[in-house]
Amino acid sequence: MSNQVRVAVIGTGSLGKEHARIYADLAKAGLAQFTGVFDANPEAARTHAARWGVRAFASVAEAAEASDALSVVTPTVTHHAIARELLILGRHVLVEKPMTDNSEQAQDLVRLAKENGLVLQVGHVERFNPVFSYLEQAAPFPKFIECHRLSPFPARSTDIGVVLDLMIHDLDVVMAFVKSPVVSVDAVGIPVLSRSEDIANARLRFANGCVANLTASRISPERMRKIRVFSGGDHPVYISLDYRVQEGFLYRLARDGEEESSLLRKLLAAKESTIVSEFAGKRIVREPVPINKDEPLKLELSDFVACVRERQTPKVSGAQAKAALDVAFEIVRQIQSSP
């Protein structure tokens, strides 16, 4: 393989076209070679190929022949067959979430990638959100986590329920963040507009004692992607973060004498920091968090290309994605088996 990775996109729907856009940008920057796109609808493939000046492939095999690494951005039910074909052909794969629609298929992809020494990355894009990067270093001892992921009913992903469509993002984030086995799951959900669950709530307990409460809805009148974390240790903090706008606040105890410091007085005067509670001589300070905003999907695809080039393990490996998927399947099982 040359130093410039040849990349292609399988599927040019609402998300696939974004993969194509970013690969085109990487190609302009000399970081990859964008070879082309394939879609089950040949006209769609030709339209997107013409837009980016690349090839419209006639088949997955033809796309693989011209490429080193490919994004699979197709309906979930097709993920396993397409990714499997590519891995057998010796190609590196980024498959969008959810990885597959059952655990056995996910394990099959993990096995094939390992046996062939290939990169298998799964598109859990929130792991590349600068919000998550900040959270990892700011809250090292999570004790309680609350996630809300709400959206109006989509025109896509109607082949799966809200757990595999939306909640899977938060399952992956929380499990990667807590770094401890899930020991219990308690879930509830209901279908409203579709045959699958459209609203779901799950409570996870981890071996280290951390508890996470996750809520997902795809029938909300507004969009929300937020995470709130209570972290313990010698310096307990509460952090509230918004994935969409990449902003948030940190709440912490003021250190002795800090309220008299010139820096805090300046922040308080500018209303960038606020004293929100006082008791027994202690004060809780709220302050905005420093986040370097960026496009998560761009960071994700750049990382995929770099992992292929350097033969490194991706941040979201197939094995990690399967672990989150298995918890998602347990949540769905509980929802479907409840009266």
Task: Give each language-model segment a name.
Residues 1, 69-72, 289-291, 299-339:
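C-terminal helix-rich "cap/oligomerization" subdomain common to oxidoreductases
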Residues 1-52, 174:
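N-terminal Rossmann-like dinucleotide-binding module
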Residues 19, 52-110:
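Beta-loop-alpha module in the N-terminal Rossmann-like domain of NAD(P)-dependent dehydrogenases
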Residues 35, 68, 143:
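Conserved acidic residues
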Residues 54, 89-91, 116-119, 210:
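A short helix->loop->beta-strand "cap" motif at the edges of active sites that frequently abuts
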Residues 100-157:
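A contiguous active-site-proximal alpha/beta segment in oxidoreductase catalytic domains
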Residues 154-222, 226-230, 243, 319:
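Rossmann-like dinucleotide-binding domain that binds NAD(P)(H)
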Residues 192, 211-299:
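NAD(P)-dinucleotide binding in Rossmann-like oxidoreductases
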